[in-house]
Amino acid sequence: MRHYEIVFMVHPDQSEQVAGMIERYTGSITEAGGKIHRLEDWGRRQLAYPINKLHKAHYVLMNVEAGQEVIDELETAFRFNDAVLRNMIMRTKAAITEQSIMLKQKEERAERAPRREERAEAKPEAAAE
């Protein structure tokens, strides 16, 4: 079995169906004896350029170990699913399990947000004294 990195973008109006899509795709991989090494749901993100007059899409990243038959099945599923705007399947040399840069940045922003709120609350208190 080979290692693959799969990224697909879903229509923003179909965001609530992403969990079901992920479950369906991961189920087909594991049923065929494959493994999922990393699964990241990046959420809605701005597109670099409009696709079908859309400016945002829901991104999902998966790193899997699977056979070619499963990958062919996934490609067909992506092609015939109208909610999937774009997809990319790349073969990699080894399993990638650490967090992606996109997810690390998202977590860093989430950590900084409470700090900003604390600073904003501290400034009015200091001005009142």
UniProtKB/Swiss-Prot annotation:
One of its GO terms (cellular component) is cytosolic small ribosomal subunit. Residues 104-129 have a biased composition (Basic and acidic residues). Keywords: Ribonucleoprotein, Ribosomal protein, RNA-binding, rRNA-binding. GO terms for biological process: translation. The keyword Nucleotide-binding does not apply. Residues 103-129 are annotated as: Disordered. It comes from the Bacteria. SUPFAM superfamilies: Ribosomal protein S6. One of its GO terms (molecular function) is structural constituent of ribosome. The keyword Acyltransferase does not apply. Binds together with bS18 to 16S ribosomal RNA. Belongs to the bacterial ribosomal protein bS6 family. This is Small ribosomal subunit protein bS6. It comes from Vibrio campbellii (strain ATCC BAA-1116). The lineage of its organism: Bacteria, Pseudomonadati, Pseudomonadota, Gammaproteobacteria, Vibrionales.
